[in-house]
Amino acid sequence: MGLFVNPDQSAFQSALNAQIYVDKSGLIEYTNSVLESTDAFICNSRPRRFGKSITADMLTAYYSRGCDSRDMFSSLKISQTPDWEKHLNKYDVIHFDVQWCMEPAGGPENLVDFITQNTLQELRSLYSAELPENITSLPEALSLINDATQKRFVIIIDEWDVLIRDASADTKIQDSYINFLRGLFKGTLPTRYIALAYLTGILPIKKVQTQSALNNFNEFTMLDARGFAKYIGFTEEEVKTLCDQYHRDFEKVKRWYDGYLLENCQVYNPKAVVEVLRWNKYQSYWSRTGTYDAIVPLINMDFDGLRTAVITMLSGSSVEVDVSCFQNDMINFSSKDDVLTYLIHLGYLGYDQNTQSAFIPNEELRQELTAATRRKRWDEMMAFQAASDQLLDAMLDLDTETVADEIEKIHSSYTSVITYHDENSLSSVLTIAYLSSMKYYFKPIRELPTGRGFADFVYLPKPEFRSDYPALLVELKWNHSAHTALNQIKEKKYIASLEPYIGDILLVGINYDKKTKKHECLIEKA
């Protein structure tokens, strides 16, 4: 057992000892299936507090020859698979956490030498005959050991991207680190001495001239998780089970912490779910993850459409984003799409592969991003807040003329980014118009199923505001009339869809006439 070579299972045991542990050992079935193949080079990126280190510790405990982990894994899901013991504790494992190494190394400029020297020293204690003293290259050392013994290594790097994020301006350090990783993993020889390479961090592998610096790796990210989706965060079924176990309101947990969509799998923030299960406090835990301060300068970058996109998402809508050009680093931001893509990797935004659009996943993140805009007192945000406040007040006062006028103004403000041509474009303007409502209401429910169709929008007030703010049931029409919209709400019994909600309800019909370019609104109490 060493610091980097063949660690024991104690780190993973600490995770198992926690009050709440969700079994993700099914991932090992996949890694076992690709061992000693060209598919065994894996990079899994995900946000902070999404279980990166626990996964790395689990793989170490399973494969490391430095421990006996049979009892540990015999009660986990992996033990239900055939031949689960075949690879258990059978490999020399090299595992290091780049973030931890920064301090003892004395800074990022010394990191590669620190990792290399310490790993070589530990390898010599195991393979003194195979590893001459004059060998100073880690890839060469692994190749020599493999040539003499035919043994392959499992290499696990936690927080692989620390230098990419924290030393982003120093190209010399970046180049040295990337070259170290290339020497370790790229080419024919690494396929001989590596049984499994597993990198984990926040960012995917950095691109060099549009190509991945390690293009032999299979990447599983917040943009494209594929088979890793159920191992990134907590799944909905896992959260339901935990809520039953800890007697928590699942629907409330869902509103606050759900929202990540990975391969049609609903994924929750594990850190937040664990905290609310333990303490029953529904609040944002995100600012404690260490990335919050990084987003304030990001969303204030001077890119066309960036602030508009953030405001649109804060209002409950999604925005299209081109994720293909982001270089997976901290310095090559060239457009709003690069910024939004980075925010997806950080976990501040969700991503829908089917529509190629970004959105704010849940109430927790909506609060954090709203706070970030306030830090810089956005003129755009303050103007929209004022207009939206007036719109919401007018709606609550049943002032239909003012509601129509305010929607008209917001429509005019957004003509550069939203072209009116159908009810969908009208709905985009409506979500922006109701930005102010997010203080008092949950994210609007789009097309809520009812007995005879779908309600266009439903705004449910947060519990603490239900005595002052009614639920809003909104129907939109295009080239019809507000009367038609209101009648549809009644005829199709949309109100029944709000059961078992108890509280006041406003029925809102809004129409846009393309010829007159006017909005019309009618409001009734249910």
For each predicted feature, which ranges?
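Conserved catalytic cores of phosphodiester-cleaving nucleases, focusing on short active-site segments
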Residues: 430, 455-461, 469-480, 492
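Domain-level recognition of nuclease-like catalytic cores that cleave nucleotide substrates
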Residues: 497, 503-526
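Structural motif
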Residues: 154, 470-474, 506
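Mg2+/Mn2+-dependent nuclease catalytic core
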Residues: 174-180, 478-495
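Active-site metal-binding core of divalent-cation-utilizing nuclease and nuclease-like domains
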Residues: 144-149, 438-468
